[in-house]
């Protein structure tokens, strides 16, 4: 997408110098496999806002990154000396400064409703991370947890999208975790999750297919095999942040 | 305060009937000792918005409550058939429908900054709940955790309030947990936390004194001995939600 510059640029390490940011430009500090940062990528894509992406090593954090975000997490955006982080705060900030492309509805109740949906769907991320690390002792509880989260997601889907007829705020915020849930059977083949999504969640399955057709999702999504390779490297304590980057 | 009706009304149980809500009125479903519900109380008080309060038993949850909020948590507000929950969502909704008394600033960056402060100060609530339940095994780690959270809070306080010269959104959202941290030495005398706040955190100590002078805090705050009695009852699995209510 023409509005992204550097979405797949090489990840910067502590020894790398931070390129200067031109006045008026917006920069996104990103990690290519972080679902929270992906929320910001989806938002920039959906709003078609021009952005320069800096990919950051989150295990060995550059000093210049911690100076900008003391929590050391992604996403962070920088804009005329202003620093904004936390994925939901970044999304609202982008809507506030570019109101013409606001993803959040203007109506107070509909706005609140989108945020409540995100809260109710957040059980998916908890369940995903639980299963990612599940041991023989707790994998049964983890699978039950995921089923419960997906049951909720299935029941809350009453239209094409969580945003209604078109995709909205809740869709942008929940998608990155659903993308990873879909890949979980490949990341953890030992858990035998293959059929989990397909048969029990017809609405959610159709929703995932629908989401994959959205231009913003096409920008942000990573191939399943890259997710698998990333998590394999992550487990070793040395995540490979540059998986899938092809030499220029 | 004249705008509150029923802030200290008797807590309703599953067998109690829910009184009808008049059209145009706003109702807050509350639990008198819940810090998240207290955020909403502070917000209604600060904005001087008229509200009817229903106190709800959160151990034995009334069916009518779960129908309104499937998560069964407080605060929830009800307003002309609309249901809004999650404390931060409730606060923004109240600002959206009563913009003249908006607590959140209009400027996008200042808005974002208030929300980032809440995120950074949220370590206080985690540390508080950790110490509330601390055992001999983990109390040292719990105390270190609280100190770290308070160090951050001390360093982030660069003016009279987190909102700046006057109290703001971040103050309303962080206060309920600070109120409880101050009472922690009485709830858990075995942890010897008495001098924790007084000596190491001069800015925070002055801030707490300043907060207690605000009209909205005077409405929402509970006496230390009521917090202690509540937590003593909570530990038994039978929380006494009606501590401090005097017969009409």
Question: What do these predicted regions represent?
Answer:
Chain A
Residues 79, 174, 207:
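Short active-site alpha-helical segment characteristic of glycosyltransferases
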Residues 198-228:
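A contiguous, mid-protein "functional segment" used to position or interact
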Residues 134, 189-197:
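Short helix/strand-bridging catalytic loops that position acidic/His residues to coordinate divalent metals
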Residues 1-166, 201, 236-238, 244-248:
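GST-like domain detector, emphasizing the conserved glutathione-binding G-site
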Residues 165-189, 200:
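GST superfamily/GST-like fold recognition
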Residues 155-165, 187-188, 214-221:
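Surface-exposed helix-capping loop/turn segments at secondary-structure junctions
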Residues 95-99, 122, 158, 177-178, ...:
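Hydrophobic/aromatic-lined pockets within catalytic cores
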Residues 224-240:
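C-terminal/domain-terminus segments
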């Amino acid at each position: 997408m023409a509005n992204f510059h550097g979405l797949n640029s090489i990840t910067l390490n502590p020894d790398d110098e931070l390129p200067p940011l031109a006045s008026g430009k917006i920069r996104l500090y990103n990690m290519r496999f972080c679902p929270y940062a992906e929320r910001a990528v989806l938002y920039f894509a959906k709003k078609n806002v021009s952005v320069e992406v800096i990919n950051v090593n989150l295990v060995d954090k550059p000093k210049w990154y911690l100076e900008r975000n003391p929590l050391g997490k992604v996403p962070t955006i920088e804009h005329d000396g202003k620093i904004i982080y936390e994925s939901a705060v970044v999304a609202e900030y982008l809507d506030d400064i570019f109101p013409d492309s606001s993803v959040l509805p203007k109506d107070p109740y509909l706005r609140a409703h989108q945020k409540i949906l995100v809260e109710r769907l957040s059980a998916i991320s908890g369940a995903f991370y639980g299963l990612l690390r599940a041991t023989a002792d707790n994998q049964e509880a983890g699978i039950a947890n995921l089923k419960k989260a997906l049951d909720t997601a299935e029941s809350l889907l009453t239209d094409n999208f969580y945003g209604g007829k078109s995709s909205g705020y809740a869709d942008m915020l929940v998608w990155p975790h659903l993308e990873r849930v879909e890949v979980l059977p490949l990341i953890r083949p030992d858990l035998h999750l293959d059929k989990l999504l397909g048969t029990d969640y017809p609405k959610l399955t159709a929703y995932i297919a629908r989401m994959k057709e959205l231009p913003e999702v096409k920008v942000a999504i990573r191939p399943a095999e890259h997710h698998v390779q990333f998590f394999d490297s992550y487990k070793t304590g040395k995540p490979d942040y540059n998986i899938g980057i092809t030499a220029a």
